[in-house]
């Protein structure tokens, strides 16, 4: 008989009646290790994490989350939550736990007039960007489009727009939260303000966040960005240049220095280091023009090995 871990370190027998009772409360599927979709649902971005929850609820909506949390509370079960599953430490999955997989909850609604987006907690960054960019709007998210919004936001979050508008958590206006007793509440600066304060950067241990309201800004839909690469032998001078430019750059310009092989591109060798530039106003030409008038160190920006 299958068993699930309890919070006191014990085990609970998952009898057919117990599983059937939970299934009757759900709209989404309840997966156990015998189900064909179980393996894919427990997998995370970090493939080194290989943990096996006792069962997985693939939530289709808030009601599924509420029912699952109440079930876990009633039986004192270990509970874990998967949003985008991108956390490097694999916090979304635990051995023997009841795992809530929110990856089917990926709706995004944009209020263009109020410049607010509501996104379900299973969204990845690309889901939000695709919908907001229809209106020439964006919020502060991260760097990788396959990252989940939930972990990013609850951990603070920073990305290409952070120099201009702060952390992701600075731009959250409200959150839908299923509390540990299975109730749904709304947390804002005015409603459940202490919960709102804790969630904005404090992680997800105060409840299961099922949706976020984000402040939007006029950005795009056309932006300028790319990768500039230099030989690895120039790394000290390039990093000095990066530090200098980062101090002087306008808030619309984001620079990220990466000591890594450059991506495949004409003129890029394996011994080439890459630096990523991203901006949403036409500043790169002016910076490169200024760089040509400065020292050898600054001329590195004007004459990289390759750009892509």
Model-derived regions: residue spans:
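Loop/turn elements at helix/coil->beta-strand transitions in domains of secreted/extracellular proteins
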Residues: 27-28, 74-78, 96-97, 135-138, ...
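N-terminal glycine-rich flavin-associated loop
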Residues: 47-79, 102-145, 149-150, 155-191, ...
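N-terminal flexible segment immediately upstream of the FAD-binding catalytic core
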Residues: 1-70, 86-107, 260-268
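Mature extracytoplasmic enzyme cores
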Residues: 21, 29, 118, 281-284
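Short acidic, glycine/serine/threonine-rich loops at helix termini
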Residues: 91-94, 151-154, 221, 269-271
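Short, solvent-exposed turn/loop segments enriched in Gly/Ser/Thr/Pro and often Arg
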Residues: 37, 83-89, 142-150
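C-terminal cap/substrate-recognition region of VAO/PCMH-type FAD-linked oxidoreductases
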Residues: 138, 175, 180-308
């Amino acid at each position: 008989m299958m068993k699930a871990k309890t919070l006191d370190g014990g085990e609970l027998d998952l009898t057919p009646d117990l599983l059937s009772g939970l299934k009757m409360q759900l709209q989404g599927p309840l997966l156990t290790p015998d189900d064909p979709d179980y393996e894919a649902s427990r997998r995370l971005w970090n493939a080194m994490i290989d943990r096996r929850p006792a069962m997985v609820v693939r939530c289709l909506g808030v009601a599924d989350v509420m029912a699952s949390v109440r079930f876990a509370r009633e039986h004192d079960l270990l509970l874990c939550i998967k949003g985008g599953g991108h956390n490097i430490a694999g916090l979304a999955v635990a051995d023997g736990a009841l795992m809530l997989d929110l990856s089917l909850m990926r709706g995004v609604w944009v209020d263009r007039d109020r410049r607010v987006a509501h996104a379900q907690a299973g969204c990845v960054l690309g889901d939000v960007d695709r919908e907001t960019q229809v209106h020439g709007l964006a919020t502060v998210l991260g760097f990788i489009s396959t990252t989940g919004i939930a972990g990013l936001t609850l951990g603070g979050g920073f990305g290409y727009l952070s120099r201009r508008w702060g952390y992701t958590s600075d731009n959250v206006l409200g959150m839908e939260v299923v509390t540990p007793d299975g109730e749904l509440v709304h947390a804002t600066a005015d409603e459940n303000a202490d919960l709102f304060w804790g969630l904005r950067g404090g992680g997800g241990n105060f409840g299961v966040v099922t949706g976020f309201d984000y402040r939007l800004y006029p950005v795009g839909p056309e932006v300028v960005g790319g990768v500039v690469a230099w030989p690895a032998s120039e790394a000290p001078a390039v990093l000095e240049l990066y530090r200098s430019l980062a101090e002087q750059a306008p808030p619309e310009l984001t620079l990220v220095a990466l000591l890594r092989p450059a991506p495949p591109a004409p003129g890029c060798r394996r011994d080439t280091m890459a630096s990523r530039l991203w901006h949403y106003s036409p500043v790169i030409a002016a910076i490169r023009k200024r760089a040509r008038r400065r020292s050898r160190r600054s001329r590195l920006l004007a004459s990289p090995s390759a750009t892509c």
